[in-house]
A protein has these predicted regions:
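Non-catalytic helical/linker scaffolds that mediate oligomerization, partner binding
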Residues: 1-481
């Protein structure tokens, strides 16, 4: 297996859970290659997340690594209720009632609903998919609060399993009262990213942004906002959603249930491409290494799936139950590191830094991409961005190159946010307000970390005056003495 110390462009998001909540193990996982830790707000209480966030910060400090924290909101609970026996076995052809007014536990004839609006969202002929599409029901009739269905594809249905409508169309709002409280909790520990579940339009993300800004105001914090694309209705609005978000997550689970499994690979490629073109980050998620929940090695298909996402240009690949509840959380991270590194080593991305015909609207963006172009064609050892907000490093990272990007920033929050950017190694460094002194300090910093050595060429960008967000206006090509 490739050593976790190997340079790797693609970042790894790992979900924290019972299997990975021991501090020493979490530290090992961070050393092995975890760049972002996901806190799943579908489980646990507010204080649990506060405690886990503190544990992540402490583990990252011990490991000497920059790690971002992503708070993943639960979103609307579109689920069936509970059963008297905990589960039932539905047979094809059987009648089954989903009743929003039912109070008693469910049985073979029907079950209550957490989502009370379902009777108003469906009509006869609609197809409902339960438990990630493993059970399929056809709607026969809607009578008051009861949805009468026929089982088309049967199987075991247990407590609180999810409901999807084929083709989309459920009206549940993306943000619930619980989500609003959870945003306040996430801002109390200054989560670097907030992932919004089930957004359908840009308006959902704008509302989430406003809630985050209000909750974060007292901490002078600005989290990145990630839209989880998991509703069929979101696809036509993808460009608008991207425009008002900092990135997207290709959430293939619910999305596959709604649009059909066969449609997801092409949609994944489209979303990754659009995110990169619009200067946004993108995370590819769901069942990437699913078999490693119980097995010590991945399947060949899982290896190909992860490698394919890497070759598509995703910023990060995400582990969910594999690290939250699996038997082999550390081994899963190591396997994913190995797959990402080998996929990147085999790729030819030279044409991705050719900007012929591209126009730029901003000076700082022009400088960032000019440095990338020059470094690529000079065969530079490193590409260095002195950045206050992280924007320069983000623009550089939208284009795939084998040259590592080092982002030097005086702000801890910026350093952590850049942990998600593909091919960016964020480094914390205080610099002088004088440009020439700052450039000299940067070279000393790079040499001390063995990033560059005598004779190496590197490209570096900065702004004058120094420390002005969005003020990058200078590029310098240097040879180390």
């Amino acid at each position: 297996m490739i050593s976790p110390k190997i340079r790797r462009a693609t970042k790894i998001v790992a979900t924290l859970g019972p299997a990975s909540s021991e501090p020493a193990l979490l530290e090992e996982m961070i050393r092995a290659g975890v760049n972002v830790v996901r806190l799943n707000f579908s489980h646990g209480k507010a204080q649990d997340h506060v405690d886990r966030a503190r544990m992540v910060r402490e583990a990252a400090l011990r490991a000497g690594r920059e790690v971002a924290i992503m708070a993943d909101l639960q979103g609307p609970k579109i689920r069936v209720g509970k059963f008297a026996e905990g589960k039932v076995m539905l047979e094809p052809g059987a009648k089954f009632v989903l009743d929003a007014s039912r109070k008693e536990p469910g049985d073979l004839l029907g079950v209550g609903l957490d989502y009370k609006e379902l009777p108003r969202d469906v009509k006869p002929g609609d197809v409902l998919l339960l438990n990630d599409g493993l059970i399929v029901l056809t709607v026969d009739a809607v009578r008051g609060d009861a949805v009468h269905t026929t089982v088309k594809l049967g199987g075991e249905l247990s407590n609180n399993k999810g409901i999807n409508k084929k083709g989309g169309g459920l009206t549940a709002p993306a943000l619930t009262a619980k989500d609003m409280d959870d945003i306040k909790t996430a801002m109390s520990f200054q989560a670097d990213y907030v992932a919004v579940s089930f957004p359908k339009t840009a308006t959902d993300m704008e509302m989430a942004r406003q809630l985050c800004m209000v909750a974060a105001a007292e901490y002078r914090h600005r989290p990145g906002l990630i839209a989880k694309i998991e509703r069929a209705e979101a696809i036509p609005h993808l460009e608008d959603i991207l425009r008002v978000s900092d990135g997207i997550m290709v959430a293939r689970g619910d999305l596959a249930v709604e649009v059909g499994h066969a449609a997801v690979p092409a949609l994944q490629k489209k979303m990754i491409r659009m995110a990169r073109e619009m200067d946004k980050v993108v995370i590819t998620a769901t069942q990437m290494m699913e078999s490693m929940i119980t097995n010590p090695v991945p399947t060949r298909a899982e290896v190909s799936d992860v490698a394919n996402a890497v070759l598509d240009g995703t910023d990060a690949v995400m582990l969910s139950a594999e690290t939250a509840a699996g038997k082999f959380p550390l081994e899963t991270v190591l396997e994913m590191v190995d797959i990402c590194a080998q996929a990147e080593a085999s790729a030819d991305w030279d044409n991705d830094t050719d900007f012929v015909g591209k126009t730029f609207q901003r000076i700082d963006q022009s400088i960032a991409l000019g440095a990338l172009f020059t470094a690529t064609h000079l065969g530079a050892k490193a590409l260095v961005a002195m950045t206050d907000s992280g924007s320069t490093a983000l623009w550089m990272s939208r284009h795939r190159t084998q040259i590592p990007i080092y982002a030097l920033t005086p702000k801890v929050a910026t350093q952590r946010k850049m942990a998600l950017y593909r091919n960016v190694r964020p480094l914390l460094m205080d610099t002088s307000a004088d440009r020439d002194t700052a450039l000299a300090q940067a070279e000393v910093h790079l040499k001390a970390r063995d990033i560059v050595q005598s004779g190496d060429i590197y490209a570096i960008t900065c702004g004058e005056p120094m420390g002005s967000p969005g003020g990058t206006n200078m590029m310098k090509i240097s040879r180390v003495v």
